Each structure stands twice: as structure tokens, then as C-alpha cells.
């Protein structure tokens, strides 16, 4: 085995000297065993990833764990390969760190479980699927107005407490129940408490059995936060390439991936770029995002929560992410305050799949009519607030009348929220969604009370609820 020794420790950056001509390759993992301070202390293994070659015999590495207690002269062992993580069935229902070590207090991962390196090339052109397929989620507002593409990348925007986590859980549940699909959740630089809550909520709702979770949270060194998204993606790619699955990959939060890269870049001594970000920002983002795609075998569809610093959409971090997105799902606090769940903004959410060539003429036409009706209602709200409904023309009154029904019908009960609401969750196929909204637009249900449309699934449930209310 190729061994070197530590010559310098600068926070999470460690320099290691090897014999001349025996430098480990870039991205190789080095192992350093930190001997316990006394006989009762446990020896700790720190993993370092090679980032730079310094001259003929030294490398600069980034630590994946705490470097507290590392000293010059400590031996570092070159593993001869990049960091690798366990893949396949053994990962389902488990929680891992960036190195693929189980952190859920369960049994350690068996030694014979297959492991894949986290650094790999994106699929080649000839492997990519050329057809654009819609991923049915069973969530009406998403399927109708901002449909997800298999192998696409979706940005999830929303402040605290508007329902990002519940929406993520419902997507995991629906993909598992209706499509038998696998989900991988990568927690990148977010709060440990949120990860813990999510794990327990998913265990309670039963979706954990179809999910692998990887966490590199806020308290971790920047190296771990920068690489944990790749660890999660590697697990997802295995399910796509070996098992032909349509996999959902959740990344929460993609901004923290960029932020960690910026910290590492500064520590490695690179010249900062705009707003202090790393000069390699676009390259790093591209290397991650290009691996998320659909091939002829299966697909990895990614849903990425995106934090926008100071609500500035021109900031280089979110702006670089936008270039890769196929759809956006915007959560709006005003809607959640009105009790409309999921609180997805039907006018701000977008998808490049919403075109007649991809979703079909009928779907496109109904979606656009729904948006036009809601937009007109939005414009009339100021007049209603000042003068009241009586001052509107008959035509405008009808628009408001239908828009409110549409707005309520965009809500639905979620399976994962059943234990809190006591209401049965609903999965609505796209055909049923289109049929329901088409009939509302045609005025077929103008006589039914508004409340009959709130938090229901299919249009038949509205009719049933309306009869009970009459």
C-alpha cells in the first residue's frame, strides 16, 4: 500500500507528503487513523480526498470528517480509489453519511455489499433516452400545470413552514405505491433536526422502506457537505442502471452544495469569482446535474430544494442552478394561510414539458385556460377588495366564481398527512385531473358550493360532497 505522512493541517485542508513518483490520483481517498488520546479512547479513521498535487511529492486534500487532533507526521494510507458508497437493496430503509457508513444505529453494512465510487462520468450520448416522458405524480396541481419529466430536474422553492417536506414525502409515497419506484434523499448542509424529523415521519408513514437516505448536515466539514450529493446520486444511479428503475432523487438543499464548494475553494487557495463564489462553480454544478438524466434503461428524476440568498434570483448560486432545471414548483405562503394544500402557486410554477407536443393538445389547452382564469381573478382582486363583488360585470363575476372553484380543486389530501388530518389521501391520475378541470371550466359545476371543491381528489368526490352539503 502507498503511504505518506501529514505535513500540514489547516482546518479541513490537510497536506500529505509521499515518496517521489508515488502521488495518489486526484479524487483518491486517503485514510488516516487517529489514535485515541488514552487507552479508553477509540481510534478514529479520518478520510481525506485528494484535491491538488503540490509539486512532485505532496498532495493537498480535503477532510470528510473533523481534523481535530490530527498532527504532523501521522501516517496517511492511499486507498487507490475514490470514496465509494454501498448501493442496491441493502441501502433501502437506511441512513448513511457521505462515506456510506450507516448512522441510523442499525447494523453496519455487510462487507459483501457492492460499493460504487462517487466520482464517475455522466451517461454517454448514445445511452440517453431521446423521448420525453411525463412522470405522473398523482398531485393535481403538479401534473396539470407544471408536469415533471422522467429524468428531469425540478426546483422546489418555498420558505419555512409552507409544506416542502410534506410535498417531498408525498412524492416519495406516490412513486413507491403507484410506480413501485425507489427514492434517494440527500440532505446537503441542512439542519440535523430536520433530517431527524424527516426520518421519523417517513418511518411513521411507512415510506422509509422504499428510500435510502444520505446526510451531510450543517455541522459537518465543508468536504462532506460538498460530496454528500454525489454519494446520494451514486446510490440512485445504481437503481437506474442495474435495476432499470425510475428513481426519485431529492436534494435538500442544492444551494448548500455550492456553498460548501465555495468554502473548500477558498481553503485550497483558488482565486474567488463573482460574489466570492468558486471559479469552478458552473463546472461543479454541471458535473452533478449532468449525471441526473434518463437513459434507455431507466431514469433519475431529481427534485431539488433551492434556497435563494436574500431572495436575489441573480445570485450566481441559484442562477447557475436554474440553467439546469426542467420545471419549477413554487410554494406560496398566502395559499397555505388560506388552507389550500399543497400550497403550490399555479401561476409561478413552470415546466418546459407543458407544451402540446409533449402533454397533448387537450392537457395543454385545459392547463392554459386554468392559468388564464386564475390570472384574471388575481387582477380583479384589488377591485373586489375596494368596491366589492357587486361592482363587477356579470362576465367578471363568472370568472371569479369559477376561479375560486379551480383554486380549491387544486388542493387535495395527502396520504402522508392522514395521521394528522384524519382525511384519506388521494392519488389522481392525469386523465382524471384534466377531465375534472375541463368540466369546471365548461361551467358544469357552477351550481355546487365552493367548499365542495376543497381538499378532494377526483371530480366525482366533489359531486358527492356537494350532495351532502345541499
Curated annotation (Swiss-Prot):
Catalytic activity: ATP + H2O + 4 H(+)(in) = ADP + phosphate + 5 H(+)(out)
Topological relation to the membrane, as annotated: Peripheral membrane protein
Compartments reported by the entry: Cell membrane
Classification via Gene3D superfamilies: 2.40.10.170, Bovine Mitochondrial F1-atpase, Atp Synthase Beta Chain, Chain D, domain 3 (1.10.1140.10), P-loop containing nucleotide triphosphate hydrolases (3.40.50.300)
CDD domains for this protein: ATP-synt_F1_beta_C (cd18110), ATP-synt_F1_beta_N (cd18115), F1-ATPase_beta_CD (cd01133)
EC number: 7.1.2.2
InterPro entries recorded: AAA+_ATPase, ATP-synt_VA_C, ATP_synth_F1_bsu, ATPase_a/bsu_AS, ATPase_alpha/beta_chains, ATPase_F1/V1/A1_a/bsu_N, ATPase_F1/V1/A1_a/bsu_N_sf, ATPase_F1/V1/A1_a/bsu_nucl-bd
Keywords per UniProt: ATP synthesis, ATP-binding, Cell membrane, CF(1), Hydrogen ion transport, Ion transport, Membrane, Nucleotide-binding, Translocase, Transport
Any single GO CC term annotated in Swiss-Prot or TrEMBL for this entry: proton-transporting ATP synthase complex
A Pfam family assignment: ATP-synt_VA_C
Main location: membrane
A GO term for molecular function: ATP binding
Keyword Transit peptide listed: no
HAMAP family, per database record: ATP_synth_beta_bact (MF_01347)
NCBIfam families reported in the protein's UniProt record: atpD
Family, per entry: Belongs to the ATPase alpha/beta chains family.
Protein name, per record: ATP synthase subunit beta
Gene designation: atpD
Amino acid at each position: 500500500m502507498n503511504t505518506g505522512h501529514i505535513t500540514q493541517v489547516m482546518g479541513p485542508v490537510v497536506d500529505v507528503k509521499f515518496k517521489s513518483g508515488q502521488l495518489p490520483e486526484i479524487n483518491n481517498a486517503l485514510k488516516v487513523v487517529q489514535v485515541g488520546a488514552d487507552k479508553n479512547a477509540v481510534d478514529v479513521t479520518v478520510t481525506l480526498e485528494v484535491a491538488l498535487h503540490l509539486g512532485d511529492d505532496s498532495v493537498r486534500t480535503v477532510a470528510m470528517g473533523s481534523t481535530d487532533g490530527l498532527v504532523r507526521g501521522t501516517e496517511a494510507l492511499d486507498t487507490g480509489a475514490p470514496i465509494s458508497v454501498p448501493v442496491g437493496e441493502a441501502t433501502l430503509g437506511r441512513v448513511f453519511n457521505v462515506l456510506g457508513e450507516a448512522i441510523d444505529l442499525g447494523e453496519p453494512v455487510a462487507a459483501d455489499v457492492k460499493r460504487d465510487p462517487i466520482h464517475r462520468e455522466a451517461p454517454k450520448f448514445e445511452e440517453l433516452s431521446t423521448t420525453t416522458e411525463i412522470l405522473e405524480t398523482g398531485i393535481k396541481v403538479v401534473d396539470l400545470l407544471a408536469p415533471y419529466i422522467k429524468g428531469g430536474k425540478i426546483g422546489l422553492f418555498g420558505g419555512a413552514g409552507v409544506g416542502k417536506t410534506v410535498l417531498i414525502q408525498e412524492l416519495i409515497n406516490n412513486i413507491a405505491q403507484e410506480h413501485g419506484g425507489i427514492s434517494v434523499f440527500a440532505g446537503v448542509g441542512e439542519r440535523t433536526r430536520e433530517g431527524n424529523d424527516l426520518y421519523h415521519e417517513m418511518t411513521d408513514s411507512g415510506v422509509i422502506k422504499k428510500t435510502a437516505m444520505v446526510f451531510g448536515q450543517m455541522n459537518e466539514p465543508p468536504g462532506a457537505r460538498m460530496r454528500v450529493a454525489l454519494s446520494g446520486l451514486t446510490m440512485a444511479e445504481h437503481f437506474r442502471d442495474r435495476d432499470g428503475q425510475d428513481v426519485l432523487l431529492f436534494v435538500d438543499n442544492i444551494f448548500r452544495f455550492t456553498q460548501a464548494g465555495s468554502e473548500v475553494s477558498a481553503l485550497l487557495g483558488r482565486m474567488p469569482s463573482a460574489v466570492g463564489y468558486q471559479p469552478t462553480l458552473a463546472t461543479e454544478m454541471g458535473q452533478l446535474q449532468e449525471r441526473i438524466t434518463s437513459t434507455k434503461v431507466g431514469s433519475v428524476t431529481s427534485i431539488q430544494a433551492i434556497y435563494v440568498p436574500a431572495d436575489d434570483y441573480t445570485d450566481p448560486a441559484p442562477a447557475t442552478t436554474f440553467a439546469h432545471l426542467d420545471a419549477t414548483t413554487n410554494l406560496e405562503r398566502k395559499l397555505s394561510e388560506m388552507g389550500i394544500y399543497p400550497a403550490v402557486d399555479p401561476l409561478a410554477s413552470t415546466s418546459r414539458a407543458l407544451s402540446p407536443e409533449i402533454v397533448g393538445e387537450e392537457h395543454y389547452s385545459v392547463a392554459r385556460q386554468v392559468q388564464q382564469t386564475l390570472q384574471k381573478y388575481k387582477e380583479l382582486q384589488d377591485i373586489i377588495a375596494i368596491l366589492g363583488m357587486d361592482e363587477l360585470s356579470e362576465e367578471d363575476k363568472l370568472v371569479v366564481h369559477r376561479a375560486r372553484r379551480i383554486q380549491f380543486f387544486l388542493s387535495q389530501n395527502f396520504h402522508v398527512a392522514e395521521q394528522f388530518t384524519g382525511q384519506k389521501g388521494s392519488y389522481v391520475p392525469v386523465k382524471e385531473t384534466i377531465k375534472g378541470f375541463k368540466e369546471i371550466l365548461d361551467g358544469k359545476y357552477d351550481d355546487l358550493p365552493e367548499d365542495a371543491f376543497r381538499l378532494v381528489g377526483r371530480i366525482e368526490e366533489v359531486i358527492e360532497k356537494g350532495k351532502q352539503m345541499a
